[in-house]
């Protein structure tokens, strides 16, 4: 035995570490967990421990070693409705695995699995049942003859249960699974592995030995592989002797925090509350890892999954009686629980908590209104929620369809999912029609044709001029053999000095030329590592195979390079002055400006902006020489290089280093020294979405032009205000003070006019059934003055006052204003100022509203003013007469 038993393994961390240590001693290379965002475009999230190795199994990528072992974080949402309901369903889980790439096979896999579970984890043989594929006699023989398992402990299952395949064709093979028996006293007769209360499958050994062709025929693979998976949460349940995975030390500390916030006890809670506690506990782990791996909440793809999980957490928190914001507190526990094994959680702590906080606040703002509408639908007694209503809940209130279905099912109501999808498709069509100006020519046939070309070699970092050969010509998205003068084309070359749009940096411009041909290139795009040069043929005929030269505009390349380096300096300055957790959310590096999007819940103050500009400009003046090197991604990250949050990188990366200032993974073009930037100026800072801010800035000549324009503006203002530039602030400040004083004088005059006008009409109030009614026209008063007049009249007339004023503030504008003010007794008999004023204003093609005792409105038809006043008088007369009759 190569692993010496020191103590009984119990905790989740001990289980994980023991697994990796055991296989490391068996010469397996320990591979760190891959991101939840997979390289595989066929899946949205990393759903299995073997997924990062799929290219190796398929022969598409070199194996990292002959043997590997890992603890891989995974997310699955296909059974989300079972999370919290069953003992073992999760969205987030960790899969322990050992892998062989053409090295050892069944015998070693089975022997080592047995050694691990019996010697290291110390499981009793009496608690272990093994399943094998019913045609896999080889595995059964190893279990019985070499391991010594009694045949009664082996269950033979069919292809559906014990045969793994990657699809209808391709690598496949039989499985052997290890089950834990919680009730061995029931004996070995008539074993039913589907009995979830008795058995739990905890270790799956996949023997990848065949290739299945289109006819279903199996042939032996040249290299046979091993792919295994052990659920960490399941093994923790077994070794910690818990009723379910949720009560293990991997999840239960999170649940305890929820109980603390909700002021409830887990073990004495009813089943409904326990389900909510488990759902929040499970989703917490998924959410913190998704955000840490670069997923942001949205209505699409992974972002939608994240948003859905957070919104389920908020709702189940409300079911537990939690009415205040609580998710960041829960997430903090999850981060502390897992950060030792996943350091990225600690590094991204602030970012994770901020994203969760913003999303929770956003959903809480609409949840109450949405739940109210949903409750009305449920309480109406109907047994089906229409697709239209379900879509309204989604579109207006942010309710994911799944949440509506979940709440409806809890109340034995169905949802018209098909109708919802029809509404969703209709909206997409409307959006598509509204965005018909978007260029979609890069899709369709062009997308398919791109696969015909090899990767374009980029040789433009150190040279702007180079020779090349034309490999492809696209005319209107169609691949053609030649194109002539005047036509707009997309050109594919074997190599190019043109930078293709990537990493936020725009594509280069310039010319592609030969003795007989000239093409003005106005943009360069990348598609699947193929550079597409967009341009107009100014001279000659282009043909496939033609030898040409590429010549990039040096001035524009220099501008882009300066702005790209400035972007790196800006990010470093933001980290130092605003928050170390600032991370890039997007960028634009253009010729004339740069734009940088970053995470921040608060606006950047003017003082901070000034400090950022000063710091960046100091780095520019210090004339730092940039160092650019290629190295392995792991080496770069160890040296402290900053990677864009959520971005995918190759194993070898390009590192742009401004010594002592900035170090980033970047494929863009840059200056040689920071002094080439000249100067740096931030021209705007704004919020573009929840938790994301945007800075636009200038460098080089663009910054100088900006300063020149501002200087010209200052000179114009100096001439206008007859003051030198140094006196402008004082001059404008004095003008503002004068303006404020003049406005006060004007308002005083308006108030005096209003007082005079309302004084002249206050005696005209009529008494109807003890109420003082005053309905009158007062022209020449603005909204504030008219309101003041109405309130003063109401105060003068007392609790039984009913004041309605209408007037034309300015005859030239041909607009009307109305005000209704009611005393307390008028409100008590049922009059409502807001409703009354709306009826009055409607006569004059207007509208308004307000409180029961005071309201205001505007209208357009001044010719109907007298009709509106007559209506008000008649309405009040009838209403008060009716009240008198009562």
From Swiss-Prot:
The gene is alaS. One of its GO terms (cellular component) is cytosol. CDD domains: AlaRS_core. This is Alanine--tRNA ligase. It comes from the Bacteria. GO terms for biological process: alanyl-tRNA aminoacylation. Catalyzes the attachment of alanine to tRNA(Ala) in a two-step reaction: alanine is first activated by ATP to form Ala-AMP and then transferred to the acceptor end of tRNA(Ala). Also edits incorrectly charged Ser-tRNA(Ala) and Gly-tRNA(Ala) via its editing domain. Binds 1 zinc ion per subunit. The keyword Protein biosynthesis applies. The keyword tRNA-binding applies. It catalyses: tRNA(Ala) + L-alanine + ATP = L-alanyl-tRNA(Ala) + AMP + diphosphate. It comes from Prochlorococcus marinus (strain MIT 9301). Its EC number is 6.1.1.7. Transmembrane segments: none annotated. Gene3D superfamilies: 2.40.30.130, 3.10.310.40, 3.30.54.20, 6.10.250.550, Bira Bifunctional Protein, Domain 2, Threonyl-trna Synthetase, Chain A, domain 2. SMART domains: tRNA_SAD. It is an enzyme of class 6 (ligase). Its cofactor is Zn(2+). Belongs to the class-II aminoacyl-tRNA synthetase family.
């Amino acid at each position: 035995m190569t692993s010496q038993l020191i103590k009984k393994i119990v905790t989740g961390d001990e289980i994980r570490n023991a697994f990796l240590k055991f296989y490391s001693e068996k010469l397996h290379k320990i591979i760190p967990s891959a991101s939840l965002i997979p390289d595989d475009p066929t899946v949205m999230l990393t759903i299995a421990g073997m997924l990062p190795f799929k290219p190796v199994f398929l022969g598409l990528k070199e194996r990292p070693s002959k043997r590997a072992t890992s603890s891989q974080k995974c997310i699955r949402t296909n059974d989300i409705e079972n999370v919290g309901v069953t003992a073992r369903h999760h969205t987030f889980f960790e899969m322990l695995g050992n892998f062989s790439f053409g090295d050892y096979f069944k015998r070693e896999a089975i022997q080592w699995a047995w050694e691990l579970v019996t010697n290291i984890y110390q499981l009793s043989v009496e608690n272990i049942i093994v399943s094998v594929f019913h045609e896999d006699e080889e595995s059964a023989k190893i279990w019985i003859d070499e391991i010594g398992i009694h045949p009664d402990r082996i269950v033979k299952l069919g292809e559906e249960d014990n045969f793994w395949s990657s699809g209808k064709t391709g690598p496949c093979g039989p499985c052997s699974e290890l089950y834990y028996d919680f009730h061995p006293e029931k004996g070995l007769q008539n074993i039913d592995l589907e009995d979830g209360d008795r058995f739990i499958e905890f270790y799956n050994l996949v023997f990848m030995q065949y290739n299945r062709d289109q006819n279903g025929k199996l042939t032996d693979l040249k290299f046979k592989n091993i792919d295994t998976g052990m659920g960490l949460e399941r093994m923790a349940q077994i070794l910690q002797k818990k009723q379910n995975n949720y009560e293990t030390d991997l999840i239960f500390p999170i649940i305890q925090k929820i109980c603390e916030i909700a002021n409830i006890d887990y073990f004495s809670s009813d089943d409904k509350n326990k389900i909510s506690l488990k759902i929040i506990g499970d989703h917490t782990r998924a959410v913190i890892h998704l955000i840490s791996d670069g997923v942001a909440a949205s209505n699409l793809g992974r972002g939608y999954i994240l948003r859905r999980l957070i919104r389920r957490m908020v709702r189940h928190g409300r079911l537990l009686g939690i009415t205040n914001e609580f998710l960041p507190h829960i997430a903090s526990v999850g981060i502390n629980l897992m950060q030792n094994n996943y350091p990225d959680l600690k590094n991204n702590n602030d970012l994770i908590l901020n994203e969760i906080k913003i999303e929770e606040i956003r959903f809480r703002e609409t949840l109450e209104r949405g739940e109210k509408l949903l409750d009305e639908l449920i309480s109406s007694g109907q047994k089906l929620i229409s697709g239209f209503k379900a879509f309204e809940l989604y579109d207006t209130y942010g309710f994911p369809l799944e949440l509506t279905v979940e709440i409806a099912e809890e109340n034995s109501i169905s949802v018209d999912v098909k109708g919802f999808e029809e509404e969703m498709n209709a909206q997409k069509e409307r959006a598509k029609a509204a965005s018909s100006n978007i260029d979609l020519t890069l899709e369709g046939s062009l997308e398919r044709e791109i696969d015909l070309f090899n990767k374009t070699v980029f040789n433009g970092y150190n040279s702007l001029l180079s020779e090349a050969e034309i490999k492809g010509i696209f005319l209107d998205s169609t691949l053609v053999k030649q194109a002539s003068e005047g036509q707009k084309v997309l050109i594919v070359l074997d190599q190019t000095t043109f930078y293709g749009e990537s990493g936020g940096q725009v594509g280069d411009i310039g010319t592609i030329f030969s003795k007989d041909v000239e093409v003005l290139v106005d943009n360069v795009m990348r598609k699947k590592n193929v550079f597409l040069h967009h341009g107009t043929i100014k001279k000659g005929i282009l043909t496939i195979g033609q030898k040409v030269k590429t010549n990039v505009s040096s001035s524009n390349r220099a501008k882009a390079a300066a702005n790209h380096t400035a972007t790196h300096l800006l990010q470093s300055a933001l980290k130092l002055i605003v928050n170390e957790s600032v991370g890039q959310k997007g960028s634009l590096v253009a010729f004339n400006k740069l734009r940088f999007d970053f995470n921040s819940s608060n606006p950047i103050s003017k003082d901070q902006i000034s400090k950022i500009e000063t710091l960046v400009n100091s780095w520019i003046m210090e004339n730092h020489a940039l160092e650019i090197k290629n190295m392995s991604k792991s080496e770069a990250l160890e040296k402290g290089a900053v990677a864009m949050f959520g971005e995918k990188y190759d194993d070898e990366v390009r590192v742009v280093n401004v010594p002592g200032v900035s170090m980033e993974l970047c494929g863009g073009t840059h200056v040689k020294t920071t002094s080439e930037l000249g100067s740096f100026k931030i021209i705007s800072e704004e919020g573009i979405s929840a938790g994301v801010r945007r800075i636009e800035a200038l460098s080089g000549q663009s910054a100088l032009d900006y300063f020149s324009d501002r200087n010209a503006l200052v000179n114009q203002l100096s001439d206008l205000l007859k003051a030198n530039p140094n006196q402008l602030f004082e001059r404008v400040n004095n003008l503002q003070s004068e303006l404020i004083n003049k406005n006060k004088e004007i308002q005083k005059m308006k108030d005096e006019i209003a007082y005079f006008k309302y004084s002249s009409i206050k005696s005209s109030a009529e008494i109807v059934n003890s109420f003082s009614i005053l309905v009158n026209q007062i022209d020449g008063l603005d909204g504030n003055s008219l309101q003041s007049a109405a309130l003063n009249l109401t105060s003068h007339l007392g609790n039984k006052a009913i004041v309605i004023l209408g007037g034309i503030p300015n005859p030239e504008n041909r607009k009307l204003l109305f005000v209704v003010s009611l005393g307390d007794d008028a409100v008590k008999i049922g009059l409502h100022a807001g409703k009354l004023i709306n009826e009055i204003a409607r006569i004059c093609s207007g509208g308004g509203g307000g409180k029961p005792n005071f309201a205001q409105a505007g209208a357009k038809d001044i010719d109907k003013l007298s009709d509106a006043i007559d209506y008000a008088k008649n309405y009040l007369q009838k209403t008060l007469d009716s009240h008198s009759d009562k």
